[in-house]
Design a protein with these regions (language model features):
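Short, small-residue-biased leader/transition segments that mark boundaries at the very start
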Residues: 1-6
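Active-site donor-binding segments of glycosyltransferases and PAPS-dependent sulfotransferases
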Residues: 32-107
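Catalytic donor nucleotide-activated moiety binding site of glycosyltransferases and closely related
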Residues: 139-146, 178, 219-221, 225-262, ...
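Membrane-proximal helix-turn-helix segments that form the acceptor-binding/catalytic region
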Residues: 152-167
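A short beta-strand/loop micro-motif in the catalytic core of glycosyltransferases
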Residues: 165-172, 277
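Donor nucleotide-activated moiety binding/catalytic core segment of transferases
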Residues: 187-195, 199, 246-247, 251-279
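A donor-sugar binding/catalytic signature common to diverse glycosyltransferases
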Residues: 269-309
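Leloir-type glycosyltransferase catalytic cores
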Residues: 312-360
């Protein structure tokens, strides 16, 4: 089952959780190691540049962007390649649909993390719809479209691609509605794989606890207001601010900078934080797993429904901050007895749906 091969800690942890869950259910599985030519190295930087209006004004600006970002992109790519090899069971490297067609399995499964959303170039990739699979069963667990604003033409194309699946369960409640709109049968909304494992289970991966009290920020999107709010919030509660990031350019955004930690340390920073500020779906998921007092800043793009969906499920919409002058959320503690009860029931329900998909 393919997962987006991005330099993203959450995606990597989601893949680990999926493998762990399937193996516990008695299955052997591998992650399809698929990499698009335009999503790595210099090509990824150039593709990203097309979406950066600030840098695309003239040739000099474009060159400056490439010179600044390429070394960072290359380093992150090498680090994540090493982590994928360390933590995941991978197939052979696949770069084309012909490579994908040579793979063999009893069941092909689409994973999570915006697999059915746009790629870096703004278009969807049929590989993530398992279009290369012709005579084997196809299922999807916690598949994510990432957004909701699809044209009628795109939805029509999606319907053709999804009609060959024998079973589908999705991660967001909005995706359930979109599938119904396409007349595609859906088993329902399920938990992201990272939430199928408990905080105690994830803690076994941690090698050392981070000492002291601190505010942690994990930010994926370019949002200056979030960066300023994190600094203001840390000052308000009188604690140091730590910033963990897989991208080096965030060093300018405030706080003690922790660049691309290994997964055990990344989890430890979240687990041991006093407060946790994030715009990341998987950041939110691990805040829930570790029962952290978190503050949610919704992404300033079209993918915020991912975060909103899990907050609605756990009835924690009040953790969303929109007034960046207001730090009073620091005084409102989350009732994790209630939240953990919701997650416990949802784990049981989601695992039941996954077992059903595998049996169909």
């Amino acid at each position: 089952f393919p997962t987006r091969r991005s330099s993203d800690l959450g995606s990597l942890l989601q893949s680990i959780a999926t493998i762990t869950t399937l193996e516990r259910l008695g299955h052997k599985c591998e992650i399809i190691d698929y990499i698009r030519d335009d999503e790595h190295g210099l090509s990824a930087v150039k593709t990203n540049l097309n979406n950066k209006q600030r840098w695309s004004g003239n040739s000099l600006k474009k060159l400056a962007y490439i010179v600044l970002r390429y070394p960072e992109e290359k380093k992150a790519e090498l680090n994540f390649r090493e982590m994928r090899r360390k933590y995941l069971k991978l197939t052979q490297l696949c770069r084309t649909h012909d490579d994908l067609k040579r793979l063999d399995a009893d069941i092909f499964m689409t994973g999570s993390d915006q697999v059915w959303g746009p790629t870096l170039n703004g278009h969807y990739d049929e590989a993530y719809f398992l279009s290369f699979v012709k005579d084997k069963r196809k299922i999807a667990y916690a598949a994510s479209l990432g957004r909701t604003d699809f044209t009628a033409k795109i939805l029509s194309e999606y319907k053709k691609l999804l009609s060959s699946y024998s079973g589908i369960a999705v991660r967001e409640n909005t995706a359930v509605g979109l599938l119904r709109q396409m007349d595609i049968e859906c088993a329902g909304q399920v938990l992201d794989p990272t939430l199928l494992l408990t905080g105690d289970e994830w803690s076994r991966m941690i090698k050392k606890d981070m000492g002291g009290k601190y505010v942690l920020v994990y930010q994926l999107h370019n949002n200056p207001a979030l960066s300023k709010y994190a600094v203001r919030f840390a000052e308000h509660v009188g604690l140091p601010l730590y910033r963990v990031s897989p991208t080096f350019h965030q060093i300018r955004r405030g706080g003690k900078f922790i660049y691309l930690p290994d997964l055990p340390d990344f989890l430890s920073y979240i687990k041991n934080s006093t407060y946790f500020i994030t715009d990341s779906f998987h950041g939110t998921a691990f805040a829930l797993n570790f029962n952290r007092q978190f503050i949610e800043i919704l992404p300033n793009n079209k993918t915020g429904n991912r975060n909103q969906s899990i907050l609605q499920l756990t009835r924690l919409q009040d953790r969303i901050v929109t007034d960046y002058a207001d730090c009073s959320i620091s005084e409102r503690m989350i009732d994790y007895e209630r939240v953990n009860d919701i997650l416990r029931k949802e784990r049981i329900r989601s695992l039941g749906i996954l077992k059903q998909l595998l049996r169909q």
